[in-house]
Each structure stands twice: as C-alpha cells, then as structure tokens.
From Swiss-Prot:
The lineage of its organism: Bacteria, Pseudomonadati, Pseudomonadota, Gammaproteobacteria, Enterobacterales. GO terms for biological process: diaminopimelate biosynthetic process; lysine biosynthetic process via diaminopimelate. It comes from the Bacteria. PANTHER family: 4-HYDROXY-2-OXOGLUTARATE ALDOLASE, MITOCHONDRIAL, DIHYDRODIPICOLINATE SYNTHASE. This is 4-hydroxy-tetrahydrodipicolinate synthase. Belongs to the DapA family. It comes from Yersinia enterocolitica serotype O:8 / biotype 1B (strain NCTC 13174 / 8081). The gene is dapA.
C-alpha cells in the first residue's frame, strides 16, 4: 500500500470554501476505478495549511468513510510543533487510516537533531506506520540522509517521501539505511521515473489527481523494469508534471480537475487565489499534450 502511484489528493470545496462531499466522493471513486495504490488525505496538495485542526480531521474521516475500504487512506499529520503533530497523529488512531505522512517542521527550521527527536517522538506516540516527508522548497528545512537513516531504525517509521528533486538522495539513503523494507517514495512528479529507476518504489503524486490511470501504469512499468515504455509514457506526461506547478500547488491541479469534470469547483481558500488566465492556457496545453483533452 506504500508503493506505486499514491495520490496527494486535492480537497474539493464548494463556492463558499466548505468541503464538497459529493466531489470528494467522485474523486475517490475515480482513484478506486483507476487502480491508485493509496490516497494521502490533507497533505500539502490537500490544503492542510488553510484547514483548521477540526476541519483537517473531518476531511480525513470523510475520505475514510467514502473510500469504504476500497482504497487505503494515509492521513497527513505534519505540524511545526512536535506536540501539535503528536496530537494530530493520535486523532487517527483506530480510525482505519493505514499510516500518516508527516512533513518536516516548517518555518522554525530545526537542526538535524531536532528533526530526529521530532519524528522519534511522533512515532513513539502511536502504532500507526509513519512516512517521513522532506520538501525543503516549502518548509525551509532539509532532512539529510543520515537523519533519515537514524529514523529508519524506528520500527513504525516505514518510508520517506523525498521531494527535493535531488536524485542523488536515493543512493545516499540506500547506502545509509540498513533495512531492505524501508520504502523510498518520490515527491516530485517530474523526476519520479528517474527516482524509481534508481531504486525508489513509487511516487506520491500531484499529477495522479488528473491522470490517475497513467500514473498507475507508469509506476507499474517501472516496477516491472520496463523503463523504455515507462519513459515514453512519462514524456507524454512531462508537460503536466511541470506545468501543474506553473502557479503554486494546488492552484493549477484544482483548475485542471474541474476542467476535466472531476469536481464541481476549483475553489481555494485565501491566501491561495484562482489560476490566472495565462496560466490556464499553459495547463490546458499540458492536458492536451497528455491526451486528457
């Protein structure tokens, strides 16, 4: 469940900014039908930063209810205070989530020892499997391979989502982690195939929100070692991988999901603003290049 194409699911909202349950069900049904390996609910792409704690928990619980056992659900549980991350993680004990994706603390920029103690404390507070999430472009904090290797020794820390885009990290982590079962996941669609060719086991994907079947196929081809065919598919998807970030994520992907009829609105909460007209043209061209329009 922690390998293959895992979608970093968008959180659909109605025109008033409330969670759109009907569209959420439609998105979940789409991923079940497409064979997506798992859903990450309320991660970065799910707008965790603009949901309060109760809303955050509610969206994950709604996702669990609507998934109804048909697809595994991973809860996003990161925070920049360890106590807050523990509290949020513990809200999902015994709910049915299969694990938690926990981003490094943001803004306060802890040292490597602080990162180790942060994730160790979270892991020790729960039996839920933990996926570390390293995305320094957003957090201002880079969790280095030696720290990841230390954390990998903790029983319920089972994987890392590496979103630096630095492919050398794959080999660096593999050399340091003495556990063949520890899973390496790419958090960068544009370099995801190369990441898997170096030994990664999947992608936690933004692109999968709107190209779910294609991302499932891409990850399956990589797992089979058929990188020639995987590269042909990836070349078709590359404009999406790149241009879904033409403006801040998840602005473009929510617009694209609405454009494709996957949800009713592309509403965001401030400070996120709607996709601009020039960017719409860029994303539309990418959708056409991928064969989705």
């Amino acid at each position: 469940m922690f390998t293959g194409s895992i979608v970093a699911l968008i959180t659909p909202m109605d025109d008033k900014g409330n969670v759109d349950r009907a569209s959420l069900k439609k998105l979940i049904d789409y991923h079940v039908a497409s064979g997506t390996a798992a859903i990450v609910s309320v991660g970065t792409t799910g707008e965790s930063a603009t949901l309060n704690h109760d809303e955050h928990v509610d969206v994950v619980l709604q996702t669990l209810e609507l998934a109804d056992g048909r697809i595994p659900v991973i809860a996003g549980t990161g925070a920049n205070a360890t106590s807050e991350a523990i509290s949020l993680t513990q809200r999902f004990n015994d709910t049915g989530v299969v694990g938690c994706l926990t981003v490094t603390p943001y803004y306060n920029r802890p040292m490597q020892e602080g990162l180790y103690q942060h994730f160790k404390a979270i892991a020790e507070s729960t039996d839920l499997p933990q996926i570390l999430y390293n995305v320094p472009s957003r957090t201002g904090c880079d969790m280095l391979p030696p720290t990841i290797a230390r954390l990998a020794k903790i029983k319920n820390i089972v994987a890392v989502k590496e979103a630096t885009g630095n492919l050398s990290r794959v080999s660096q982590i593999q050399v340091l982690v003495d556990d063949e079962d520890f899973i390496l996941l790419s958090g960068d669609d544009a370099s995801g195939l190369d990441f898997m060719q170096l030994g990664g086991q999947g992608v936690i994907s933004v692109t999968a929100n709107i190209a779910a079947r294609e991302m499932v196929e891409l990850c399956a081809l990589a797992a089979q070692g058929n990188f020639a065919e995987a590269r042909r598919l990836n070349q078709r998807l590359m404009p999406l991988h790149q241009h879904l970030f033409v403006e801040a994520n998840p602005i473009p992907v929510k617009w694209a999901a609405k454009k494709l009829g996957l949800m009713a609105n592309d509403t965001l909460r401030l400070p996120m603003t709607p996709l601009t007209d020039p960017a719409k043209r860029v994303v539309e061209d990418a959708l056409k290049s991928a064969g989705l329009l």
